[in-house]
Amino acid sequence: MSLWPEMATGEFALKTVNAGGVRTRYLEAGRRDAPAVVFIHGTGGHLETFNRNVFEHAEHFRVLALDMVGHGFSSKPDHPYEIRHYVRHLDDFLDAVGADRAHLHGESLGGWIAAQYAIDHPARVDRLVLNTAGGLNTDEAVMKRVYDVTMNAVRNASLETVRKRLEWLVHDPREIPDDLVELRHAIYTQPGFERAMENILCLQFMGVRMRNVLTEESLGRIRSKSLVIWTDHDPTAPLATGERFVKAIPDARLAVLEGCAHWPQWEAKERFNKLHIDFLLGR
């Protein structure tokens, strides 16, 4: 298994753009005049989170996937990254790539960002997909686990510790190919990345988290038709959390992808791609 066969048979471009002063690495595929869909990764992640989804979506959409501020190979300004900073970066990115309006897909932290963006900028969001999203969970044990396994992969970076971090995302560890481990190891061993990860992980501290959390009241202001995707083995929050999102968002429905953990777009690509594309197309 490899990270790259998924990307070998279609056309795409890896680019960088200045998004509000943040040098932002992103992937683009599909027709520029097609409706845009933006894929937003989770904590410590990068755009390759969505390698298994790009070309199926590019048949219908202008696909954009980016390394969020502080993440991947994008710029890493030295300050703690709270949700408002990610929301501002996403808004600047949409401006920079000329996408006035887009579907948003957010995985984990990306779902937290996407939900808050839909609350703050409703006119710019078409349909919204929250994939095992953060933002409601305030379980200190989970927060500590995220912090510990992530910082260990950075402070003691090796192929083994990085693999352990990635395997935490999936139900079957065989889903993690060696070259994905090598890519993330390259990201985690960039000069200064330990400091960047400390800034990323500020949301795992309760005081910071509580001033950023989503609430039923704030989710009730989302006007986009929404799909909440959950799994039966998610390590960050139970299915009940997905149900809370659906109950709070006025026009939302729930889909559960079984046999998956925290990366259903990767673990169950065929089921995910069909579900996701059908939803975005209104089928």
Each model region followed by its residue ranges:
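Conserved alpha/beta-hydrolase catalytic His-Asp/Glu region
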Residues: 24, 141, 156-221
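Conserved HGGG/HGGXW glycine-rich cap/lid loop of the alpha/beta-hydrolase fold
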Residues: 18, 22-73
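Flexible "cap/lid" loop of the alpha/beta hydrolase fold
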Residues: 115-119, 126-162
